From Swiss-Prot:
The keyword Cytoplasm applies. It is found in: Cytoplasm. It comes from Staphylococcus haemolyticus (strain JCSC1435). Pfam families: Arg_tRNA_synt_N, DALR_1, tRNA-synt_1d. This is Arginine--tRNA ligase. HAMAP family: Arg_tRNA_synth.
Amino acid sequence: MNIIEKVKSTLIEEIKASIEKANLAEDIPEIKVEIPKDTKNGDYSTNIAMVLTKVAKRNPREIAQAIVDNLDTSKANVKQVDIAGPGFINFYLDNQYLTAVIPEAINKGDKFGCAEESKNTNILLEYVSANPTGDLHIGHARNAAVGDSLANILIAAGYNVTREYYINDAGNQITNLARSIETRFFEALGDTSHEMPADGYNGKDIIEIGKDLADKHPEMKDYSDEERLKTFRQLGVDYEMDKLKKDLADFNVHFDNWFSETSLYENGAIDNTLAKMNELGYTYEADGATWLRTSDFKDDKDRVLIKKDGTYTYFTPDTAYHYNKINRGNDILIDLMGADHHGYINRLKASLETFGVDSNRLEIQIMQMVRLMQDGVEVKMSKRTGNAITLREIMDEVGIDAARYFLTMRSPDSHFDFDLELAKEKSQDNPIYYAQYAHARICSILKQAKEQGVEVTADADFSTITNEKAIDLLKKVAEFEPTIESAAENRAPHRLTNYIQDLASAFHKFYNAEKVLTDDAEKTKAHIALVDAVRITLHNALALVGVSAPESM
C-alpha cells in the first residue's frame, strides 16, 4: 500500500470510529476520502457528512461537526481539520509524512509505482488489428499508442496481460487485395487487360508488390486463376503483415500473439461455435439464413450468422474468436476498436451471453477519429486513393516519442486534433518536450552534484525539505502509484500523460523557486534525493506510455 492509500485508509478508519462514537449511524455507508483539486480545501477531504444526512436526520454541517468533535487525528499526521461548504470535512496534514516516498522511490527504482501484489486477473487486450491490406494510418497509430500504453499500465497495476493482434486474413478484403496485386502484377509485365476491382487497393505499396512479384516470379502469369488468386492472397497478407509488424515494432509496439482469422476456419472453431449456439437453442432459420437470437441479450435485433448463399457474415468468425478468447482462460477481454465499430458492441456482448458468459467480461473501447493538423489546416487522408498519411510518415515527421505521447494525451472516446507543428517544437508549449526536458534537467543536476562530491542517498535528513514548492513536488511523486491504479481501473492512459505534465510542472516550479545545490550540506543531500525520486518517477511514467527519458537535450 502506497503512502497516499495508507493515509486514506487511516483517515477512513478514524472517521468510522468517530461516527460510531457520535452515534450517527448503525450501518455506516462507504466512506470516501479524496484529494481535493484545490489545495486550499486541504490535503484530503470527505463528503461523508452529506451522505449521512438521511440516516442521521440532521443538517450535514451538524453531522460534520459531530464527526470532527469525536475524531482522533493523531494516527494520520493531521494538524488541522475544518468544515467547508455544505458539510465537507477537510484535513490538513503535517507534510513531513510525504518524505517517506523519497527513499521508497530510490530503493525501488524501475519498480517504483508498480503494484507489489498480483491481482490474479488475466486480461486479453486486443488492439490495432488493422486489415493487412495497406499501410497503417493515423487512426491505427492512435489505437497502437493507446493500446500499448494501456497494456503497460495494467501490468504495472498488477494484472496479467496478453497483447493480441487479430489478423483479418480470411475475408473479402483479402480477395480484393489479391485481385489488386494481380492487376499490378500484370501491369508490370505490360498486360493492362486485368481491371482493378471496384473495391480494390490503389496504394503505392500494392504497385510495389505487383512489380516485385513480376520481377521475381513472372511465371505466375501462367498459373490458373484459382491458383494465382490463392498464391496472391497469401503473399499479399505476408507482405503487408511484415511491413506492418516492422512499423509497429519501430513505434515501440509489440504483441504477444498474432492471431489469424484463417485459423478459426482451419481448426474448426467456427463450426464448433455454431454447433454450440445451436445446441443451446439460440440459432434459428429465417429467410434462407441462419440467425442468432442476440435480441434476447439487449441487442436491438437478431443477427445473421450464415447468409442465404451459405457464406458467413463478419459477425460469425468474430463470435468464434471471442469465445476462443474466453476459453483460453482470460477473465477480462478488452477490445480497442475504430469509431466505425460502435454498432458491434451489443452484438458481441450478446454472443458471449449465449454461452453463459457474463457480458461485462468484454469491454469494448471505441477509438474516436484523429485529425492531422498543419498550420491550422487539416491534412486529409484517404487510404484507398494512396494519399493516406501513414504511421511511418508520422514517425518520420515528428519522431516516435512525440507521436506516442500526443496520441495518448486525450481520452480515446474523444476526437483529437494532432498538431504536427506543435509536436516538433522545442519549447515549453510542446507537452512531450516539456516533460522530457524536466528529466534531462534533473540528470544534469545530479551530474553536477556528483562532480561536487554529493551522492544520492536514501537516508538524508528530509526534515530540511520545507519549501512549499518542494512539498507540492513530493505530493506529486506520492500520487504516482494511485495514478497508475486509476488509469488501469478506468482504462485511461491519458490520466498518466496528464500526471506527467503535472509532475514536470511541479518540478520546474520547485527548480525556479529554490536552489537544489545549496551551502547547507544536509539540505543539499535532501534536495538531491528528492530530485532523484522525481527523475525515477518521470522515467517510469514516460516508459509506461512508450516514451524515452533522455539524460540530455
